[in-house]
């Protein structure tokens, strides 16, 4: 997001370039798939040699605009959009963890996140240990060689407890583990965990 724009202006006005129809707001692309110039164009697109839309379930102009807008508001380098918060959490953790790893999570997390940690991760030999938000200073004692991620929500769901992100970030950096934050309530207007 351009520093010349206030946050609110950027949130509303950052959008994809206008088409030849000069629409005021972005057009909705309600298509399942996109066309290609020829077989070679299609092959190169599927091989990700070209940045072209293939299927809307992967990307389309609206999805790209949404991701670009959130990335700008969050102060991130890049991002992905998911259909739900749990899809984002599962995809993120699934991409970063492997059998034998440990997640160190705040005890206060969304019920479905807790179910992921207690019902599904054990099937894949991924362990989850918990720390209390009120006693976050003791988190370092829980970090082990197999700890790959510190996970937390802030504000928590449903308790709305607030974590010190800079504190957690410093611990994660010190121990070479990733910090994953679910920012479900605060939105980038109030809190930017990435920045």
Put a short name on every predicted segment.
Residues 1-60, 68:
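N-terminal "arm"/small-domain region of PLP-dependent enzymes with the aminotransferase-like
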Residues 23-24, 75, 124:
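Short, basic and Ser/Thr-rich N-terminal targeting/leader segments
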Residues 30, 43-48, 52-54, 73, ...:
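Generic alpha-helical propensity signal that fires on short helical segments
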Residues 5, 23, 59-63, 110, ...:
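Generic structural signal for well-ordered, non-membrane alpha-helical segments
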Residues 25-28, 37-38, 67-70, 94, ...:
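A broad "ordered helical/assembly scaffold" signature
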Residues 38-87, 112-119:
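Conserved N-terminal alpha-helix of the aminotransferase class I/II PLP-enzyme fold
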Residues 2, 13-17, 78-195:
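Conserved PLP-enzyme active-site core in the AAT-like
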């Amino acid at each position: 997001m351009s520093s010349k724009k206030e946050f609110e202006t950027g949130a509303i006005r950052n959008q994809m370039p206008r088409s030849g129809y000069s629409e005021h707001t972005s057009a909705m692309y309600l298509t399942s798939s996109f066309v290609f110039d020829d077989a070679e164009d299609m092959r190169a697109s599927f091989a990700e040699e070209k940045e072209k839309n293939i299927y809307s379930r992967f990307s389309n102009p609206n999805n790209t605009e949404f991701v670009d807008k959130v990335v700008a508001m969050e102060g991130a380098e890049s991002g992905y959009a998911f259909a739900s918060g749990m899809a984002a959490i599962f995809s993120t953790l699934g991409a970063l963890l492997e059998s034998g790893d440990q997640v160190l999570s705040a005890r206060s997390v969304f019920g479905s996140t807790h179910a992921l940690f207690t019902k599904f991760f054990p099937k894949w030999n991924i362990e989850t240990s918990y720390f209390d938000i009120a006693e976050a200073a003791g988190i370092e004692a829980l970090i082990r060689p197999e700890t790959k991620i510190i996970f937390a929500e802030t504000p928590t769901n449903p308790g709305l407890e607030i974590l010190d992100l800079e504190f957690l970030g410093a611990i994660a950096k010190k121990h070479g583990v990733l910090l994953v934050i679910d920012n479900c309530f605060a939105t980038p207007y109030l809190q930017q965990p990435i920045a």
